[in-house]
Amino acid sequence: FRLSVDDYHRYIYVDNGRESVHRRIPGVLHTVNPVANDVCPIYKENTREYSLLKSEHFGTLLMMEVGALMVGKIENRPVMSHVRRGQEKGNFAFGGSTIIYMTQKDKVFPDMDILINSADGIETKVQIGSRIGKGKN
């Protein structure tokens, strides 16, 4: 999920679970505008932080925050073992940024509009609390 300057720059846990492993990957600060990714591999070069969440409904999730040109500062809350859906995980200091979620195969199924737009290179605007897919029951 890419946040633009006018978005709320706090992010939350998407499910109840147990958080483990927290790592920071130093890097540079390119813009996270999709056009920039055509020029340089921003998801490989930008400053990043990631953690793993063993979630109740979606298996193990990798949650990664990517710093951006106007942000740079990723402010994650101290790691707690048990977390709750909707609990604040952290925030970006200012500007636009990206949040990446990686899931186990066949555990999460994105909604069709997101799949179609992504295949066409179009971002889908989402808001906190809006559905973006479903977990395998």
Tell me what each language-model feature is.
Residues 1-137:
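Contiguous, well-folded functional domains in the mature portion of proteins
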